[in-house]
Amino acid sequence: MSDLILKCEGVGKRYRDGGLDVPVLYGLDLEIRTGESTGIIGSSGSGKSTLLHILGGLDMPSEGRVLLMGEDLRALNQRRLGDLRNRHLGFVYQFHHLLPEFSALENVMMPLLIGKKSRKEAVETAMAMLDKVGLKHRSTHRAGELSGGERQRAAIARALVTQPKCLLADEPTGNLDRANARNVLDMMLELKTELGTGLVVVTHDDELAGRFERVMVMKDGSLHPRQGANA
C-alpha cells in the first residue's frame, strides 16, 4: 500500500477583489507521506495558511488538484468530502477552539461521538489520548480551568483521537511562550512517530521549523525546499 497521504499537483489559488483576480498561490507541487513531518515557513501573507486550508479540503484550488488518499477533492460532493476529511485529517489551530462549556474529556470525545462511536468507547479512547498528551489528571476540567499549554494539548488530543492519516497544524504554538511552544512541539513529534501520522505545520518560527524532517519556504505564492534543511 502506498504511504502517500496528500498530493498537490500544480495548485494555484486566486481570489476576486473588486472585479480583479488576485493570485495567492502559483503552481504548487507537494507530497505528504505517512510518518513524515513537514514545516512550512514564510512571512505573513505569503500564502501558508491558504495552502493548509487547500490541503485540508477547507478551500479549493483555482487551478490544479489536491489528492487525499488518491481521491481528487474537487471531484467530490460535500458529503463525500466531509467524510473523507473527517476520516483521514486532523486540524489544530493557533487558538485551541475548545468548547468552553465542556470538559477536556468531553471535547476530545466529540469527534468520536460524531463518528457514531458508543459513549463507552468514546470515553475510553478519549481518556487514552488525554493520557498520551499528559492531561489524564485534568480530564474533568473545562477549557477555562486549563493553562494555555494544556488547552493546546487538549486540542491536539481532539485532533488525533480518531487516528487520522495526517495532522494539519496552523501556527499551533503561536499563542504560547517559548517553553510551552517547545513542549507542545515535542509532544506533536512524539505522537507523530508513535501513531505513524503525517504532520504538516505552518509556522513563522524558524527555530521550531528546524525540528521538522523537511522544511518548505513559502514566498510570493511559491513553495521551495529550504536550503540546508533536513532531507
UniProtKB/Swiss-Prot annotation:
GO cellular component, one term: plasma membrane
GO molecular function: ATP binding; ATP hydrolysis activity; transmembrane transporter activity
Chief place of localization: membrane
Transmembrane intervals: none
Enzyme class: translocase
Keywords: ATP-binding, Cell inner membrane, Cell membrane, Membrane, Nucleotide-binding, Translocase, Transport
Location in the cell: Cell inner membrane
Domain ABC transporter: 6-231
Ligand binding (ATP): G42, S43, S44, G45, S46, G47, K48, S49
Alphabetized PROSITE patterns for the sequence: ABC_TRANSPORTER_1 (PS00211), ABC_TRANSPORTER_2 (PS50893), LOLD (PS51244)
Entry-linked CDD domains: ABC_MJ0796_LolCDE_FtsE
SUPFAM superfamilies, alphabetized: P-loop containing nucleoside triphosphate hydrolases
SMART domains the record matches: AAA (SM00382)
UniProt similarity note: Belongs to the ABC transporter superfamily. Lipoprotein translocase (TC 3.A.1.125) family.
Role noted for this protein: Part of the ABC transporter complex LolCDE involved in the translocation of mature outer membrane-directed lipoproteins, from the inner membrane to the periplasmic chaperone, LolA. Responsible for the formation of the LolA-lipoprotein complex in an ATP-dependent manner.
Protein name (Swiss-Prot/TrEMBL): Lipoprotein-releasing system ATP-binding protein LolD
Organism: Neisseria gonorrhoeae (strain ATCC 700825 / FA 1090)
Gene responsible for this protein: lolD
